[in-house]
Amino acid sequence: SLFSLIKAGAKFLGKNLLKQGAQYAACKVSKEC
């Protein structure tokens, strides 16, 4: 259904944002931006 598709997309986006956030934080901590 459309709802489950939207939920799957949101979960995928959330994971991507978490990964990007972690990379950004690591970059800031190590000052290698």
UniProtKB/Swiss-Prot annotation:
Any Pfam family from its record, for instance, is Antimicrobial_2
> Which keywords label this protein?
Amphibian defense peptide, Antibiotic, Antimicrobial, Disulfide bond, Secreted
Has UniProt tagged this entry with the keyword Disulfide bond? yes
Q: In which tissues is it expressed?
A: Expressed by the skin glands.
Entry's Gene Ontology BP terms:
defense response to bacterium
An example of a Gene Ontology cellular component annotation for this protein is:
extracellular region
Enumerate the subcellular locations listed in this protein's record, separating them with semicolons: Secreted
List S-S links within the chain. C27-C33
Q: What family is reported?
A: Belongs to the frog skin active peptide (FSAP) family. Brevinin subfamily.
**What this chain does, per the record?**
Shows antibacterial activity against both Gram-negative and Gram-positive bacteria.
The name of this protein is Rugosin-B
* Organism this protein belongs to: Glandirana rugosa
